[in-house]
Amino acid sequence: MTEPVRFARREDIPGLKALWRRCFPGEPEEAERFFETFFAGDTFILWEEAGEPVSMAALLPCRLRLGEERLPMRYVYALCTHPDFRRGGRAAALLRFAEEAMAARGVAALCLLPDSEKLLRYYEALGWRRAFHVPAGGSGAPGGGDTLEYPEEYAAYDDWLQALDPGEPAELPGLMKDLVPGLPAELHAAMPRPMN
């Protein structure tokens, strides 16, 4: 049986917003702002059950600087599964789909920022490696000084979120998954030193 994973379409947005609000019960306008800012043809993937999304992730475009070269990269954001459908391998299937689909599009790597030690161990068990960190008080978007570049709307969205809930700043480990075989060793050396 093939997995019901696919790229999201415009008509999926209401279901994706409902899933977002169920998994991330913060400010109600957050889902509206996020989808208005980031929805595009290949930026959202979902797992569908009975015509409704039960697991999703955003694959936000960014670039990895490697010397003078700029490599396309995707920032995996808002990976979530409805509580009634957890522990069925759906998130792992979404990540596999993301790896295959983005590699086919020439994307060099995926990155993400797990917000707990439990998630960090989960992603590492799936083959992700620690590659950078976002210092306390830094942007929630992938950082790393001059190593990662992301569009201005990411920073604007992150600033908007911080204004909604300033909270305590935390240092976050960043994980990467290489999609292109034989990426140069400088890729790893260029990334800021990961947290221990």
Briefly describe each language-model feature range.
Residues 95, 102-115:
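Conserved GNAT acetyl-CoA-binding A-motif
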Residues 127-196:
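Amide-forming acyltransferase catalytic core, primarily the GNAT-like/NAT-type
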Residues 15, 19, 93, 97, ...:
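Alpha-helical elements of Rossmann-like donor-binding domains used by nucleotide-donor carbohydrate transfer enzymes
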Residues 61, 82, 87-88, 123:
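Non-catalytic interaction surface on structured domains
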Residues 118:
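Conserved functional hotspot residues or short segments at active or partner-binding sites
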Residues 5-79, 181-196:
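A conserved beta-strand-loop-helix scaffold within acyl/acetyltransferase catalytic domains
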Residues 78-81, 87-100:
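Conserved acetyl-CoA-binding loop-helix of GNAT-fold acetyltransferases
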